[in-house]
């Protein structure tokens, strides 16, 4: 089997808490940028595990269309606010098996208890052991006067999206109000593909991921890749002899990376061409071959003759060339 290029993953940008990240994947065989980008995006948008509120219980309220005396917001608005809670549930302390076997009457409940005028925020929620609210500044409701508010909040783990109707079937209690659950920890994910030309035309995949804090952006890509990999493994097992075949060629990439990191001093250019490239900030072969012929021609004091010289040196020494216009 003809081998494919082995690619590298580099971080372009990450915020301090790593909930947002921009990553570059290259070099990919032409066409694989869209193939990988689309597959990863679809998995991240729909199939990553997370946690979410699925129901709540409000003292004195039996349905979502009621009002709490002394509270500015109606119950519908309170529910909309609570839907935005980012709830973390410890894997070590509370397993999926425990949650699936726990009846709603014994569920570990997060609580709001207030009786003074003011804004109630997510940071005011009392959490049981193994639960934590991440977005503590989220406003839940406003007490316009001294009034009693008692809210029990139920959260669990899951994947994707579940409607209130789906959650209702698992609750079985009229006093508990089911709500929609969005378990996906991804806020946004996008990608685009750029073409790169050196000795061959390759794809460069740029992926941008933002999360709600339950997962790091880099981990989101890793988990999505693991989900895809495990779904493909049974298909590979149709022909088990394929396990011994190396599909990605590591040597080619290592050699190419060495070529690209070579300083332009080693091209043995004329003094004029060398000085012009240096003044323009071009230090390595990679910075040179990612530019087109017209870009190099437009550098001050360079022209078509210099471009021919540079291309000749790249070809003779490293089997590389400038990008076509």
Swiss-Prot record:
Assembly behavior: Homodimer. The RNAP catalytic core consists of 2 alpha, 1 beta, 1 beta' and 1 omega subunit. When a sigma factor is associated with the core the holoenzyme is formed, which can initiate transcription.
Signal peptide: none
Protein name: DNA-directed RNA polymerase subunit alpha
Region (Alpha C-terminal domain (alpha-CTD)): 255-325
Pfam families: RNA_pol_A_bac, RNA_pol_A_CTD, RNA_pol_L
Taxonomic path: Bacteria, Bacillati, Mycoplasmatota, Mycoplasmoidales, Mycoplasmoidaceae
Record EC number: 2.7.7.6
An annotated GO BP: DNA-templated transcription
């Amino acid at each position: 089997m003809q081998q494919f290029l082995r690619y590298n993953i580099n971080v372009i940008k990450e915020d301090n808490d790593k909930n947002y990240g921009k990553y570059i994947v290259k070099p990919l065989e032409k066409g694989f940028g869209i193939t990988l980008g689309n597959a990863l995006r679809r998995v991240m948008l729909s199939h990553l595990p997370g946690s979410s509120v699925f129901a709540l219980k409000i003292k004195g309220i039996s349905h979502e269309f009621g009002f709490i005396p002394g509270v500015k917001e109606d119950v519908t608005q309170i529910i909309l606010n609570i839907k935005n809670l980012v709830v973390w549930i410890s894997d070590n302390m509370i397993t999926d098996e425990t949650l699936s076997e726990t009846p709603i009457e014994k569920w570990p409940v997060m609580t709001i208890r207030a009786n003074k005028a003011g804004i109630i925020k997510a940071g005011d929620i009392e959490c049981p052991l193994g639960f934590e609210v991440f977005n503590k500044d989220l406003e839940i409701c406003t007490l316009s006067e001294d009034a009693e508010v008692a809210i029990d909040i139920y959260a669990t783990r899951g994947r994707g999206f579940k409607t209130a109707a789906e959650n209702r079937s698992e609750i079985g209690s009229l006093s508990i109000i089911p709500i929609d659950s969005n378990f996906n920890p991804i806020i946004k994910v996008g990608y685009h593909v750029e073409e790169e030309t050196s000795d061959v035309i390759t794809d460069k995949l740029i992926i941008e991921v933002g999360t709600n804090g339950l997962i790091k952006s880099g981990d989101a890509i890793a988990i999505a890749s693991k989900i895809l990999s495990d779904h493909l493994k049974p298909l590979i097992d149709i022909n088990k002899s394929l396990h011994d075949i190396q599909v990605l060629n590591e040597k080619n990439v290592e050699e190419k990376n060495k070529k690209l990191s070579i300083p332009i001093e080693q091209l043995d250019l004329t003094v004029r061409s060398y000085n012009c490239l240096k003044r323009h900030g071009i230090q390595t072969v990679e910075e040179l071959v990612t530019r087109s012929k017209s870009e190099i021609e437009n550098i001050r004091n360079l022209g078509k003759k210099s471009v021919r010289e540079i291309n000749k040196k790249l070809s003779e020494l490293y089997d590389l060339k400038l990008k076509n216009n």
